[in-house]
Amino acid sequence: MNFLNEAQAYEGEMRAFFEDLHRHPEPSHFENRTNRRVREQLKAHGIDMLCPKDNITIAVIHGAKPGKTVGLRFDTDALQLQELCDVPYKSEHDGLMHGCGHDAHTTCGVYVARLLKTHADELCGTYKIIFQPAEEGEHGADEVIATGLVSDVDAFFGLHVWSLYPTGTLHATPGGIWAEPDMFKITIHGKGGHGATPE
């Protein structure tokens, strides 16, 4: 298995899918179009899925050999911000944009599912690719857990794009990172941006 080479072969398709999601951002709890697009891709490639709600999709890939169940979580919601960038795939929805990379995360999830499906006969265990709504402080993980469809997951993994690192690199740390221990409110005046890096 050479996942990197295979993933690079999907680059054109991935870019088109990403740009479509970027043009059509959806707020927390209303990621219905995003999930329809995800489901179209999964169905086209024969990937089993669980669809407990219009805004939650869980792709399921069973490996040929027994093993544990792994959850791979990808968030889908956008931010309530006006996009100021002038790119060909700019948000078509006033006051909404993918400013935190969830369009990229969702794209990664779709193509991870495709790669795992392609190699299912070589894999152990079960893989659940979870397209989570409402990650932006809106209890989307609770919504997924409440479905009961991830109670069998032995280990969860997630990812986040970060512009501080070069494209094509992976950075990991043992244990949790950037876990939210508490909520607080502050007021920042500026042009706009993500709460982690306000302008």
Residue ranges and their predicted role:
Residues 1-98, 107-110, 114-123:
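Acidic/His- and Gly-rich active-site-bordering loop/insert found
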Residues 79-81, 87-97, 104, 121-199:
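Histidine/acidic-residue-rich, glycine-tolerant segments that coordinate divalent metal ions
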